[in-house]
């Protein structure tokens, strides 16, 4: 990945999957995120985070958002597309957030102006049900705490299912090395046979 970031034209928009990577299940470590940030800064790339599975990697919203916070603290201007379709079970409701992070007030105003134009022309009246559910969960302390517990349960179940699949494949003597199943994170797994 580092080689690809270095080879990309300076100032490229780089889409980064925040956590529980789809389709590989392979997430960068914190040390790898630091290196990714260094290369993105050197090449003057623009990071755009896809945050579709927050909470599914570790069961902890804050832990899963570490890379975004690191980039923000490092002073990056960036975008984050955050979906609540999976982690709040709001499939088909189009519930999510778009975050633009900048330390420049003029840039923020310009981006907001463009987003308002796009929103008005593209989705003048978005579905409200999913947004209201998400807002209720995010703004009510009791619901928010319950949601965080549910995410821990779901991610724990995913981890347990990975272990059980791995153990069954080993028990059956299935040819190959299946350790990637328990090393990967989230709902997705990629196995490449060369």
Predicted regions and their residues:
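Conserved PLP-binding catalytic core of the aspartate aminotransferase-like
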Residues: 146-194
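Active-site phosphate-binding strand-loop segment of PLP-dependent enzymes
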Residues: 1-56
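Alpha-helical subdomain
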Residues: 33, 55-64, 117-124
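Short, electropositive alpha-helical surface patch
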Residues: 35-37, 64-77
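A short acidic (Asp/Glu
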Residues: 25-30, 57-65, 91-92
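Amphipathic alpha-helical segments in well-structured domains
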Residues: 29, 33, 64-68, 112, ...
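Conserved core segment of the aminotransferase class I/II
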Residues: 73-148
């Amino acid at each position: 990945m580092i080689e690809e970031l270095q080879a990309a034209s300076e100032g490229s928009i780089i889409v980064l999957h925040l956590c529980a990577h789809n389709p590989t299940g392979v997430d960068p470590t914190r040390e790898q995120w630091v290196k990714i940030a260094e290369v993105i800064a050197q090449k003057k790339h623009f990071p755009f985070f896809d945050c579709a599975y927050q909470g599914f990697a570790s069961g902890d919203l804050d832990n899963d958002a570490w890379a975004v916070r690191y980039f923000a603290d490092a002073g990056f201007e960036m975008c984050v597309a955050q979906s609540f379709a999976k982690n709040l079970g709001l499939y088909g409701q189009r519930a999510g957030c778009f975050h633009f992070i900048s330390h420049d007030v003029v840039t923020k105003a310009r981006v907001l102006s463009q987003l308002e134009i796009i929103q008005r022309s593209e989705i003048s009246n978005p579905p409200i049900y999913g947004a209201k559910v998400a807002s209720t969960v995010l703004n009510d302390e009791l619901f928010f705490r319950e949601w965080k517990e549910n995410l821990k349960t779901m991610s724990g179940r995913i981890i347990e299912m990975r272990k059980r699949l791995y153990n069954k494949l080993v028990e059956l003597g299935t040819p190959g090395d299946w350790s990637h199943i328990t090393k990967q994170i989230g709902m997705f797994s990629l196995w490449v046979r060369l």
